[in-house]
């Protein structure tokens, strides 16, 4: 697979303007990235500009804290898909996981997988807030709930992707599930290290620099 197809070209800053999003979309088309990842209010715009291409539209749910209710996340998912999203990056309820409420976490992922129908679901576990044991548990619950990917980070918390976390997550989910590294990846070397450790998708705001 060519390097560009690993990349979710990402712009999730709250101050991003329509002009910024359109630039992101044009870059994704030029460099043939896997997707653009944008906030839900920009999904329609992204869909309209990418529907005749093979670049997917990715958006976020329960972002960035993961602390909204399951019902809220399900509704967000349904609206995003109606607006044209192909991929959903959802944030788990980190506090519920850390409280040992495994069934809650599994249920919310399962509900979002169901709401997404045949669309891709990536589960953001926010590795920087978890112990090693919790990281493995989050990955296991994601797999059991039927998600397609586990993802390291929102990029809005205390840390981003680390190679050792990618390796741990890959070992936890096995070969038949995607692993997305996101947060703090700024160079091609960093991206290649993530891929070597098991990442099958890279979330980055500097996608153009990574493939030039």
Swiss-Prot record:
Pfam family, one: DeoC
InterPro entries, alphabetized: Aldolase_TIM, DeoC, DeoC/FbaB/LacD_aldolase, DeoC_typeI
Localisation: Cytoplasm
Protein family (similarity comment): Belongs to the DeoC/FbaB aldolase family. DeoC type 1 subfamily.
Lineage: Bacteria, Bacillati, Bacillota, Clostridia, Eubacteriales
Pathway assigned to this chain's UniProt record: Carbohydrate degradation; 2-deoxy-D-ribose 1-phosphate degradation; D-glyceraldehyde 3-phosphate and acetaldehyde from 2-deoxy-alpha-D-ribose 1-phosphate: step 2/2
Alphabetically ordered keywords of this record: Cytoplasm, Lyase, Schiff base
Protein name from the UniProt record: Deoxyribose-phosphate aldolase
Gene Ontology molecular function: deoxyribose-phosphate aldolase activity
CDD domains, per database record: DeoC
GO CC annotations on file: cytoplasm
Catalysed reaction, written as an equation: 2-deoxy-D-ribose 5-phosphate = D-glyceraldehyde 3-phosphate + acetaldehyde
Gene Ontology terms describing biological process: 2-deoxyribose 1-phosphate catabolic process; carbohydrate catabolic process; deoxyribonucleotide catabolic process
EC number(s) stated in the UniProt entry for this protein: 4.1.2.4
Source organism of the structure: Clostridium botulinum (strain Loch Maree / Type A3)
Active-site residue numbers: 89, 151, 180
Function: Catalyzes a reversible aldol reaction between acetaldehyde and D-glyceraldehyde 3-phosphate to generate 2-deoxy-D-ribose 5-phosphate.
């Amino acid at each position: 697979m060519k390097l560009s197809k690993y990349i979710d070209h990402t712009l999730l800053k709250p101050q991003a303007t329509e002009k910024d999003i359109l630039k992101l979309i044009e870059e994704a088309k030029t460099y043939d990235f896997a997707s653009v990842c944008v906030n839900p209010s920009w999904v329609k715009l992204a869909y309209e500009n990418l529907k005749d291409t093979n670049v997917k539209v990715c958006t976020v749910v329960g972002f960035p804290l993961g602390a909204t209710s399951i019902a809220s996340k399900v509704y967000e998912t349904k609206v995003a898909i109606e607006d044209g999203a192909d991929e959903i990056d959802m944030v788990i309820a980190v506090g519920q996981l850390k409280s040992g409420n495994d069934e809650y976490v599994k249920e919310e992922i399962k509900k979002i997988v169901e709401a997404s129908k045949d669309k891709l679901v990536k589960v953001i576990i926010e590795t920087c807030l978890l112990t090693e044991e919790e990281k493995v548990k989050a990955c296991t619950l994601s797999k059991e709930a039927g998600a397609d990917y586990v993802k390291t980070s929102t990029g809005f918390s205390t840390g981003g992707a680390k190679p050792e976390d990618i390796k741990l997550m890959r070992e936890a989910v096995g070969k038949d599930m995607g692993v997305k590294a996101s947060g703090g990846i700024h160079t091609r070397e960093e991206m290649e290290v993530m891929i070597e450790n098991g990442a099958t998708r890279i979330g980055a705001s500097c996608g153009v620099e990574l493939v030039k």
